[in-house]
Amino acid sequence: MKFPNLLSLGVAASTTVLAAVPNQKPIGDTIEDVHLGKFLIELGPGDTRWVTEEEKWGLRRDGRRFFDITAEAEQNVFPRTFAQTTVTFPTELQNLAHVKKLASSLSKNRLQTFLTKFTSFYTRYYKSESGRQSAIWLFEQIEKTIQESSATEARVEKFEHPWGQFSIIATIPGQTNKTVVVGAHQDSINLLMPSILAAPGADDDGSGTATILEALRVLLKSEAVAQGKAPNTVEFHWYSAEEAGLLGSQAVFAQYKQDNRDVKSMLQQDMTGYSKGTMNAGHADSVGIITDFVDEGLTNFIKKVVTGYCGISYVLTKCGYACSDHASASRYGYPSAFVIESKFEYSSKLIHTTRDEVSSLDFDHMLQHAKMTLGLVYELAFADL
C-alpha cells in the first residue's frame, strides 16, 4: 500500500539493525538480470518508464504506485487490449441466515495467533530467504485448514515465480468453472532498506492474509461448499511481490488470461486491521470501499454485503492507480474490487516500517472484514453469474 513519511515516524536505522541479517541475501531475479538492473513500470495509463530498483523504492517512498510491467515487455503482452468481462451481480442477498450462522464461527483469537507467528519472520520481502520461509509456513497453514475440513476435492497449490517467494492458490471446486476469487498479498517490505531492515508487515498485509485465511476456514464448514455443490468455483489467493509492483498477482492473472479462465469476480483484502486513524478523527468505525479503478457492479454488490453481514458501515474512498492486487485482475479483464480498513487518509501510517506490528491492530475490526469476505464469497459462490 502507500508509504508514510518516515521522518514523521522517527524511523531511524540503528547501527545494530543496519547490520546484514543472516539468510537475507536477495534471491536472484532473472527478469532484472536481462535488462541490466532496469525495470519497466507503469505509473498510469500509458505513463511508462525504465527505472532501477532503487528508483522503484524511491517512487514508493514518495507515495507513487505502479505496475512493474517488465515481464509484459519481455513477452509482448498488451493487457490494455483485453476486453473487460461483463458480469451481472445479484441485486439482493440470498443467504443471510446461513452465512450469519457460519460467521459466528469466525475467531479473533485465531486471527491474532496467526498474525503473531506470521509477523515473527524478520521480513517477508519477496526476494529474501525469510520471505520464502514465510511463504512455506503460510502454505502449510492453508494446507492444514483444508485437510481439517470435509472438502475432499479442495486443494492448495504453489504458483512459482523467478524470485524466491511463491504465490499460493487454494481452490474449492464448484459445479462449473466460473470462478470467484478473494486475494491478499503475503509479502512485506521496509522501504528504507528492503533487503536489510525488518518488515513485520502486521497490517500490510498480514491482516488481509489472516482475514481471508479465516474466511476460508469458516467457508469450508458449509457442507454444500465443501462437497462442491456450489454453482461456482471459489479461489483464495495469497500473492507474492505486491510491494514491488504487483508482480505476483500480474503473473497469476496473466496465466489465467492465457488459459481462458472464467473469473467472474476478484476482491482484494489489503490492510484490514487498523482503526485508530478513523477513531482519532472522531468518526465511527467503518470499512473503506474503494471506488476508483474498480468494477462498479461488483463494488455496488459489496456495499450490500457490508450492510447485510457487518456490524459496522462503510465509507467510499479512493486509492489511485495500481494501488493493490485487484488492479492486476482488472488489467487482464476481470471484474475486481478492493475493501480497505478505513477511508484511505485514515489508514495506517506505520506500514513499510519496523513499527507495523500486531499491537497496532484492532481484531474486532478485522473480524468485520472476515464477515464481509465470507458473506461475499458465499453469496457469489451460489449466484447465477
Swiss-Prot record:
Zn(2+) 1 binds at H185, D204, D270. The keyword Cell cycle does not apply. Keywords: Aminopeptidase, Disulfide bond, Glycoprotein, Hydrolase, Metal-binding, Protease, Secreted, Signal, Zinc, Zymogen. GO terms for biological process: proteolysis. Residues 20-87 form a propeptide. Its cofactor is Zn(2+). Pfam families: Peptidase_M28. It is found in: Secreted. GO terms for molecular function: aminopeptidase activity; metal ion binding; metalloexopeptidase activity. Its main location: secreted. Zn(2+) 2 binds at D204, E243, H352. Glycans are attached at N177. Residues 1-19 form the signal peptide. It is an enzyme of class 3 (hydrolase). Its EC number is 3.4.11.-. The keyword Disulfide bond applies. Belongs to the peptidase M28 family. M28E subfamily. This is Leucine aminopeptidase 1. The lineage of its organism: Eukaryota, Fungi, Dikarya, Ascomycota, Pezizomycotina.
